[in-house]
Amino acid sequence: MARFTLPRDIYHGKGCLEELKNLKGTKAVLVVGGGSMKRQGFLDKAINYLKEGGMEVQLIEGVEPDPSVETVMKGAKVMQEFQPDWIVAMGGGSPIDAAKAMWAFYEYPNTKFEDLITPFGFPELRQKAKFAAIPSTSGTATEVTAFSVITDYNTGIKYPLADFNITPDVAIVDPELVEGLPVKQVAYTGMDALTHAIEAYVSTLHCSYTDPLALQAIEMVLAYLPSSYNKNMAAREQMHYAQCLAGMAFSNALLGIVHSMAHKTGAAFSTGHIPHGCANAIYLPYVIRY
């Protein structure tokens, strides 16, 4: 027997960020990263949409790349004080991953980080809040996956937390958020998406449900990543969808040794910060050859 899990709703297309105003609740925490969403005006849009829907909004800003256990704990404390019924995470993989882990500690304050390391060992979530994810990069696909990557810098270990409980309830895949993405990020996140799709397709857990998603994602990345890098906005839109398809595939088929090594590299060389997608791009051809 196998399981295939996706978010309840996936909104896609230009302007679909507006769907935030249709979330039903009274309080929302909005988790973001280093400031790009604020500079581009999307943070204000998101706040206004949530308020238009009748929600009080609390902001958690400044989630760093490769978020730490400490960042997760600080965010969970804010949530415990505010008591939201929606957690909305907007940005690259880091703020969304961090918010997923915060979610667990918000609902279960006595849980320890060590309790979450065991794959598929999370407690039952949605006792207090639901989760909406809005990606601003075209690579991690954490908006549709059962994974969250958190780094313990004290031990130098990057933990891929895994549980279907942390699959978001709602994913909002709006290509307008990636139109201003720097070309290096386009390249790194695009290679992350390609690696997701390839590893899902050759995974020992691949199946008839995941294969079409993985293959379509591979074809789309090959077709659109070069043009996306060259700032073709139509190609960036298609890359945003391709990475989401790859996420649907690997969330259910899982990944392989490329990602295992890339996670270790990101934690071991944290001071120099090797971007995750860059590490994937380095390892992928050697693993394929192997």
Give the role of each language-model region.
Residues 9, 28-29, 58, 85-88, ...:
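Structural motif
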Residues 8, 14-15, 33-34, 63, ...:
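Fold-independent oxyanion-binding glycine-rich loops
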Residues 70-176:
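Glycine/threonine-rich beta-strand-loop-alpha-helix active-site module
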Residues 1-86:
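ATP/NTP phosphate-donor binding region
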Residues 267-290:
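Gly/Pro-rich interdomain helix-loop hinge
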Residues 147-253:
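Carboxylate- and glycine-rich phosphate/diphosphate-binding segment that chelates Mg2+/Mn2+
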Residues 87-97, 255, 260-269:
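Glycine-rich phosphate-binding loop
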